[in-house]
C-alpha cells in the first residue's frame, strides 16, 4: 500500500502564531515524513479560506519543500485550474519537476469554493468546462514541440515549454472525482483519483466503482493510476489517549471549518457547498466518524485495522493522512506521525489491494 501526507495547511485561529512559524512547522513535518520513508506529500490550494487552508500558491511551497527533502514525492492536490492561466501552470510544473529531480506528482481540479471564484472574477458555473480546456492545453504543451489551441475560455498559439520535464511524457497526474464528467476524464486518461471525508464511504465506493468501470472499458496507456483515500488521522500510545486528545481537535475542525462562512460578495466557503447540515452534525460526532471510517484515530494497532478496513471497503491502494488538523500542537502532530511511521507503516507496506480490478459493490 502507498502511504502519504495531505496538508490543508491550517492556522488553527491562533493569533500568536505567525505565518512564518506556520510554514516552518509544516516543512518540519514534511522533512520528518521524508526521513521516515513515506511515499507522498500533497498540499491543497485554497484562497481567502482563513485558518482552514493557508496555501494559495502550492507551487511556491513545493519549491521550498523540494530543497528540504530527498525521496518523498511532492505535489499539489490540486491546482484549481479555472483560477490559473494554463500556460503558466505548464511552465511552473516543468520547473518543479526539475527542482524535485523527477519527484513531482501533479493534481488538477475544478475547485470547491465559490468565494474564491468571485474574488478572481471567474464564473463559478463554468468551472468544469474551464478545467477540461486548461488540462488539454497543459498536456498539449508538455507533449508537443509547438502547441496551438483555441477554446471557449483559453487559447494559445505555437507554444512550447522552454523547460523540459524530467518525467516523460509528464509527471503522474491526480484528480479528485465527484461528478460523472470528472470520473470519465480521470479514468479514461489514466489519472489517479482521490476521495476525502465529506462524501462518506458509500459515495467514495460508488465513485471508485464507476472509475474502475471506465478505466477497464477505455484501457488508457501509461503507468497504472492510484485509487486513494484521504483522512484526518491521530495516533497515540493508546486508544484512550487518542480519543481524549483527538476529540477536541476533530470537533474543532468541523465546528469551525465545516459550516457555511461568507466573505461579503465573495460567497460561501467550499465545504458548505458539499456538506448539508445533517452530514456536518454526523461528522462532528467523533465516535460516529471513527465507526464509519471518516476519522482514523487510535493506538497504532487500532489504526492499522481502521486503514485496512476502509481500503477494503473502497477498493483503495493509497492512503493519505492529514496529521496537522484542528488545533493540534506541533509536538502532538509529530508524535502522531512518529507512531505511524514506526508502528503502522510496517504493517501496511505488505497490505496489497488490486484497486483497478476490485470487484464492484453489490447493489
Q: Each PLM stretch: what is its role?
A:
Residues 3, 45, 65, 96, ...:
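Conserved, mostly hydrophobic/aromatic
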Residues 7, 125-161, 202-316, 345, ...:
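An alpha-helical appendage that flanks or caps ligand/catalytic pockets
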Residues 34-35, 62-70, 93, 97-104, ...:
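Acidic (Asp/Glu)-rich catalytic clusters
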Residues 40-61, 80, 112, 198-199, ...:
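Glycine-rich, proline-tolerant flexible connector loops at the mouths of alpha/beta enzymes
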Residues 11-23, 79-87, 167-177, 291-300:
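Active-site mouth loops of central-metabolism enzymes
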Residues 82-191, 201-209, 213-219, 359-363:
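Internal, glycine-rich beta/alpha segment that forms the wall or movable "lid"
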Residues 3-7, 41-43, 74-76, 104-108, ...:
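Hydrophobic faces of well-ordered beta-strands that scaffold small-molecule active sites
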Residues 1-68, 72-73, 168-171, 358-363:
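N-terminal beta1-alpha1-beta2 module of alpha/beta enzyme domains
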